[in-house]
Amino acid sequence: MGKNVVVLGTQWGDEGKGKVVDLLTDKASLVVRYQGGHNAGHTLVIDGEKTVLHLIPSGVLRDNVKCVIGNGVVLSPEALMREIGMLEARGVPVRERLLISAACPLILPFHVALDVARETARGDKPIGTTGRGIGPAYEDKVARRGLRVGDLFNPELFAAKLEEVLEYHNFTLVNYYKVDAVDFQKTFDDAMAVADILKAMIVDVTELLDQTRLAGDNILFEGAQGTLLDIDHGTYPYVTSSNTTAGGVATGAGFGPLHLDYVLGIIKAYTTRVGSGPFPTELYDGLDKQDPVGKHLGDKGHEFGATTGRLRRTGWLDAVAMRRAVQINSISGFCLTKLDVLDGLETLKICTGYKLEDGTVTNVTPLAAEGYEKVTPIYEEMPGWSENTVGVTSLDGLPKAAIDYVKRIEELTGVPVDIISTGPDRVETMILRNPFA
């Protein structure tokens, strides 16, 4: 029998999921995106060549893999066509490998306009969205007024639905945010221009997944963003608009949760965050916080967002938050990424608890952003190492201090580290236990 594996982020995104998904897809038949949209940025480096994907699953560069976009993904036709064009220009036969659920909500120009207008109106207190219309598209889905991919194939129905929802949103754009209305005819024409292209890729995702499972083939589910950005379990309201946790697989792909065999949590050897929101172990943000260790992490780790290009805030590893990620996702094993970025640091710190305002200590995360902003991290110090770990592919090749750091993460979280990444390239990895084995 095959195995069904979930790969997801355990922090605030940017943990290195793209590389890991690409690495594991040599054993998978399907790679499935189940939430998010083109706000995700998954970077792959293969033989020195860099590819950044935002919407299409990271398995698209593999000949043996079909890539699936499930119903939980909000889909921008414009972004999809741009990504298809980029890959086809490099000789990748995307349309032969990509399958899409007709139930995917569409991201249309008025969603982007709303997203940008709202962030602008928040002034110096933005949520930190990518401005790509993700949140407004999910809002329309929940409000049951959104258009879906399947609507594109009935032009009359699409036009009627578009006219209704556009009237609703244009009223807000013009009268509340004082920006221009979105044009109906251009929105309609642009959508119809890609309808036939998308129609050729439509599939019943639930049926496909079940038949693949019954055939004994492996399925890999690729998460976007990270656990601490989950709409329900993250640092609300500084979160994304979807469920980034393992439960999102069932709802966002239509796959029964009892069929999941392994959840791989991607954990960076330190912590980063893009945009606004609490960050207890933060060291460096390029503005108010200027700790040299944090700058080292950002510079050596090339910490700039793959989607937005924004500087990522950096800080020490937070084991309290990691324990919560383990609880929510029932994580089977970790993939520890960017261990090499810690090379050269004399002392390392891991947050093992939070001190509250009244002086009490807890190892439980707060329920919302307001609680996070009031905690002080409690650190455990460990010796660092001076040796170079870039490209090391066996535990024996790591310095003792690095091995001790890995073991301490396992002890604090109760989860084994099954994969260690020591560089951006596919080959700069040690697999201690393969999730598909």
Swiss-Prot record:
Catalytic reaction annotation: IMP + L-aspartate + GTP = N(6)-(1,2-dicarboxyethyl)-AMP + GDP + phosphate + 2 H(+)
Gene Ontology cellular-component annotations: cytoplasm
GO annotation, biological process: 'de novo' AMP biosynthetic process; IMP metabolic process
Biological pathway: Purine metabolism; AMP biosynthesis via de novo pathway; AMP from IMP: step 1/2
Residues annotated to bind substrate: A306, T307, T308, G309, R310, L311, R312
Binding residues for GTP: 13-19, 41-43, 312, 338-340, 421-423
Protein name: Adenylosuccinate synthetase 1
